């Protein structure tokens, strides 16, 4: 990887490589764009196969956060942090050392919890910096509001594809039954949707069967089901050259991040196949909305009102895609980049005045 060329192509402002010997720490903080506000992005801790994989993850996810904030009309930019470590080696000393790196950015980057980082870990990080979210329990966690946003996104996709506001009788395959996936199943079940579910943890799948009458399928079978909607709520990169040919769903709308293994190639494959794709960073913006409201003083009513905007934003994106003959992924980027450009122009005019 040519580092500066990659950073330039992706539009990043800053990439911070964090290294320490006592305790030993390797971390990367990627700041993509701060036009709309400070970069917000969670921290994940993973034993990446190599440093390049960690960097790619940070760069791609931070860019996605920029687009997510812009599409959600949140005054924040995009960032992401990755700690390269085995979860078994996670210690308070390591987390506090990381917190000091975050603090050195003086509020330019605000972080929270992601893979292998717990609320308790966030509280440990907060001993070294105030630039974290997820310390307060007032917001009740991001899962309820994230799942609501995904549910509203599914409704928007159904309206765009079939000009219908009804979900009853539709068949939906949900991949991944963590907190968001489980909450989404509850919303869908309440609207008389026929659920098909899969999870690498059989206990979670059986719970969905018991609670929501879902049909449990093997993780490898979830792609090829004859369903109306496929909702990926687990890992990223699952929409790829291997899985897309198996898809029978006409809509993809789920909570997982970075669903497209290759954004350009695989969004085009979905479009050619006639599948309406709901861009992940738009439909799953509820989590960002939740933590942003926590940062400014949590107001549940305001947060839930903001998440309802996901419905209208997706309808606008679907319309742009149709009118301009582009993929929905490109349409979402254009919407986000227009909002960022408009903000830059407004700031330039204000400075000139």
Swiss-Prot record:
It comes from the Bacteria. NAD(+) binds at residues 44, 114, 146, 176-181, 204, 255-257. Gene3D superfamilies: Leucine Dehydrogenase, chain A, domain 1, NAD(P)-binding Rossmann-like Domain. Keywords: NAD, Nucleotide-binding, Oxidoreductase. InterPro entries: Aminoacid_DH-like_N_sf, Glu/Leu/Phe/Val/Trp_DH, Glu/Leu/Phe/Val/Trp_DH_C, Glu/Leu/Phe/Val/Trp_DH_dimer, Glu/Leu/Phe/Val_DH_AS, Glu/Phe/Leu/Val/Trp_DH_bac/arc, NAD(P)-bd_dom_sf. The activity significantly decreases to less than 20% of the original activity after 24 hours of incubation at 4 degrees Celsius. SMART domains: ELFV_dehydrog. Its EC number is 1.4.1.19. The keyword Metal-binding does not apply. The active site is at 80 (proton donor/acceptor). The mutant TrpDH-4mut (L59F/D168G/A234D/I296N) exhibits higher stability and specific activity than the wild-type enzyme, and could be used as a simple and rapid enzymatic method to determine L-tryptophan in human plasma samples, which is useful for the diagnosis and treatment of inherited metabolic disorders of L-tryptophan metabolism. GO terms for molecular function: L-leucine dehydrogenase activity; nucleotide binding. Homodimer. This is L-tryptophan dehydrogenase.
